[in-house]
Curated annotation (Swiss-Prot):
Cysteines engaged in disulfide bonds, as pairs: 26-80, 82-87, 91-184, 92-103, 145-204
Organism: Drosophila melanogaster
Topology of the protein relative to the lipid bilayer: Multi-pass membrane protein
Extracellular side stretches: 21-229, 284-290, 361-386, 461-469
Protein name: Probable G-protein coupled receptor Mth-like 11
Cytoplasmic-side segments: 251-262, 312-339, 408-439, 491-532
Amino acid sequence: MGMFRVEYLLLGILVIGVRSRDIPNCDFFDTVQLRESEKLCNGSYRYEDVVIPAKLTGKYDYEIDYDGDRVSVPKHIRGCVCKLKTCIRFCCHHKKLMAGNLCSQDVYENLTYEYTLDITQLNGSVIKKHVLNDMVVQQDLPLPCERHYSLDAETSTYDMWSLYENGSLFRHFDQRYLSKQEFCLQPNPTSTGKNYSLIVAFNCIQKPSMKMAYGRFECVRKSRLSNASIPVKFSSVFFMVITIAAYLWLPKFRSLHGKCCNLYFICLAITFLLNVISLFGIFELKTPICYLTGYAGYFTVMATFLWLSVISFDVWRRFAMRKFQVFYKNKRSSFFNYNIIVWSSAGLLTCIIFLVDQFVETNLDNPYNPAVGVFSCWIFTNGWSATFYFYAPLAILIILNCASFFLTTRYIYVENKQNQKVLNNSEPQKLSRNHANYRIYFRLFIIMGGSWFLEIIAFICEMENMWKPLIILNDYINCSQGIIIFVATFCNHEMFRLIRKRIQNRNITSLELTNTSRPVESEKMADVELGK
């Protein structure tokens, strides 16, 4: 038995001894394969015109894929060549082209392109370097991600980028630095119709975390809590579906106010779903289905906040004008008018951004372009252009909602104060009434969209790069709107009483239909008279 254990111990030591040995203080993305390189007598390797000393080589049995995970591969030798000479990362062999999201099978020996690139040094100066003569081309690294899109600066100023001496890339449109793990370079046929190719950067189509807001906050994407927003948003949609179903099922919510609330919930749920589609890059950029998703998403966002304003106005009118009987006689026409106002206004705003996209050039220097479908299947919200088309309309509607909320709560407070003077209630009655008032104020605050006011503040903070905790807090509040609405409207004794009553009425109706197989003569006469 002891001999058996000794054999296993020796085997374990042997396995440890032959394990892969990474190069100390060398990132995997600064290495190249040396499988076909010449090995010198002193243990060094010659890679192109660079001699890599033995201490900068190591045995690897893995590669790092586009998700950052280690993937087991046959053991091979790698050298940390980027410590000796400036490296440039290509997606494939420098004589190949990208075919979709993969490298082409063919090597184009006659492929020619501009081999000189502008390289930004650490001190900020820009020098020109020849790709093949002045740098080491890394072309054996795994592709940086599953799906890519090219930054073609020749055709769009939105696609401007700068390459740095340390191998990182600066993307101009969102002012972001990308490591070599997040991009690669490759010749690409020019889209101007001329018969030559340019080196362009292929960067990743991100799969960002499932957060609400509208896919803009970098600090939320980088937050440790960002993954927690995925189940929160799914839960939010789930609870909104329950709330919508309850409003459709219960007769009480077939009133004017109930119909308006339900349309608000439906628009918000659709907005959530379309936003999810845009965040996950399900559709290819600049395709008809991508444009359709972006414009439909903008339409539902505007409709959501317009219905919220309608609800706020309707609640205020119910309290402030309830003495006027004419208000109660025109509910059907009011609902029709509300629909006309909401859908036509949302449609008009959507038409405006569509026309601007068609006739205004997409340019980073132009702050008036919505850029729907350019960077994601959504309106561009990472710059100040979002102020004109997105946050300005929302800010106006949110301010109107807050004003309606203030006027409504003030009216309730003043009226209750007058009632207390008239009734001269005892202390317990006053306390009970105060608790009831607080519940009313809270529900009004939720229904009238008071929490959305943080959305505008958070956008300004994001643009000015300040108060990041507030931005994250706002994003999670917005992400859980469906849960908040469910708690505020569904979780109360009145709602449970209505559900119980509805179920009991259905049971009684089904029992009566079962026991009465044929109508009696008096019921037939009644039916005839009703049919007259």
